[in-house]
Amino acid sequence: MTAANQNYGTGRRKSSSARVFIKPGNGNITINQRSLDVYFGRETSRMVVRQPLELVELLDKLDLYITVKGGGISGQAGAIRHGITRALMEYDETLRPALRAAGFVTRDARRVERKKVGLHKARRRPQYSKR
């Protein structure tokens, strides 16, 4: 892939990190050398990945080459969406207000809360016995 006429965006969500390259094409989405439908079995994950492209109506005008690592399926889909959004803003800055209004520009900063000593999980307490 040549560096000319392509745009790049990095996306992160939970512990996942995605690198997204977009260039003019006919709508092919390649994730880790696999197609979108092969990589994500769940339709909800595929929908999350397509959201920014459908919003700006560029789904069938751009090819996407994506590498993603870390985390689970949901986190990876969110990281890819964030990366696509950043790459689209680099591609055309006039798309920023629409993407911002949809909430795609802001990085979701929620992380897994750590487990505390004396608790079963982050907030799950042992059962309380009155007597």
From Swiss-Prot:
Signal peptide span: none
Alphabetized UniProt keyword annotations: Ribonucleoprotein, Ribosomal protein
Top-level taxonomic group: Bacteria
GO cellular component terms given for this protein: cytosolic small ribosomal subunit
InterPro entries per record: Ribosomal_Su5_D2-typ_SF, Ribosomal_uS9, Ribosomal_uS9_bac/plastid, Ribosomal_uS9_CS, Ribsml_uS5_D2-typ_fold_subgr
SUPFAM superfamilies per UniProt: Ribosomal protein S5 domain 2-like
Gene Ontology process terms (BP): translation
Gene Ontology MF annotations: RNA binding; structural constituent of ribosome
Family as reported in the entry's similarity comment: Belongs to the universal ribosomal protein uS9 family.
UniProt-recorded name of the protein: Small ribosomal subunit protein uS9
GN (gene name): rpsI
